[in-house]
Structure formats: structure tokens, C-alpha cells
Amino acid sequence: MSVKMKKCSREDLQTLQQLSIETFNDTFKEQNSPENMKAYLESAFNTEQLEKELSNMSSQFFFIYFDHEIAGYVKVNIDDAQSEEMGAESLEIERIYIKNSFQKHGLGKHLLNKAIEIALERNKKNIWLGVWEKNENAIAFYKKMGFVQTGAHSFYMGDEEQTDLIMAKTLI
């Protein structure tokens, strides 16, 4: 069992797009209407949007490979790329997406540790993320990894307003 990571570049756009759609759809389709899923996937993961994100110097994506097969990725943001105003001392983990077939292999922990490594390299004092209040597995994982809920914000899945919990962890 080998685990490797690779920083994504613009050349990885198609792979990133396919992986994003697959993992998001597999995770959330049972709890959301097909119309809202379609609207969100088309908005969040269209080619233009992902090109913009990949080109942003304040965002980074890293693929994770398990036994040489792509299994998921993490996206982190600093400064003005953060989806909420959390200040210069914070790093946001915007996405940790792992294919269903690769879950329960410790890959989420690897991706989270990569985010922490980046935060520490950049002298960030905190890391934070938003997680859907109904995503109980993810919430339990983040709590186990030392995150605490610090607030909440609205997240729109198509035309449906949902609540994301803001969870944070102090690093320094």
C-alpha cells in the first residue's frame, strides 16, 4: 500500500473536474434533489470555474494516490481565496474529497496533514473548514482530528439553502 501526493496544475483540470463531480455526487446525491445537484455541479465544477481556482495563487490543490491510482484531493485557500473572511493568520481547507472506494484507508488524515503542513510553512495559526451539518461522518472525523465548531454559514445547493458548520483548529 503506497500513498503519494502530487500538486495539481492547470494540466490536471480534466482529471480534477471528473474527480470533483464523481466524489461530490457520490457523497451528496442521496440527500439532495437531482435538480439541485445538477445546478451545483455545473456551477462549482465547470471548466471555467476550475481554471480560475487553479490559477489563483492563494489556492492549492493536491491529488492523493493510493497504490498508484488517484483516490481524491484536497484544496486549500489562504488570504482572499478563503470563502469566509478569516484573516491572514488562517488557512481554509475548502475540500477534502475521496472516492468512495478509497475511504477508510486513512487518506483523509493524509490530506488533512498536508493542509496542516502548508499552513505551518506559511506561518498560519489556524486552519478552518465548512462542513454540511448533515455530513455526520465528516464531522466526526474532524472532531477526532481536533477541530471544534466555531460557527455556521449558509451554503446553497442549487436553490436550497443549507447550513455548513464552521470548524477550526488552532495550530500555533
Swiss-Prot record:
It catalyses: an alkane-alpha,omega-diamine + acetyl-CoA = an N-acetylalkane-alpha,omega-diamine + CoA + H(+). Disruption phenotype: Cells lacking this gene display release of repression of protease synthesis and sporulation in glucose-enriched medium. Its EC number is 2.3.1.57. GO terms for molecular function: diamine N-acetyltransferase activity. InterPro entries: Acyl_CoA_acyltransferase, GNAT_dom, N-term/lysine_N-AcTrnsfr. Pfam families: Acetyltransf_1. It is an enzyme of class 2 (transferase). Disulfide bonds: none annotated. Acetyl-CoA binds at I96, Y97, I98, H105, G106, L107, G108, K109, N135, E136, N137, K144. The active site is at Y142 (proton donor). The record marks Y142 as: May have an important role in the acetylation of the polyamine. The keyword Acyltransferase applies. Residues 3-172 form the N-acetyltransferase domain. Keywords: Acyltransferase, Sporulation, Transferase. Belongs to the acetyltransferase family. Involved in the protection against polyamine toxicity by regulating their concentration. Could also be involved in the negative control of sporulation as well as production of degradative enzymes such as alpha-amylase, levansucrase and alkaline phosphatase. Catalyzes the transfer of an acetyl group from acetyl coenzyme A (AcCoA) to an acceptor substrate and releases both CoA and the acetylated product. This is Spermidine/spermine N(1)-acetyltransferase. It comes from Bacillus subtilis (strain 168).
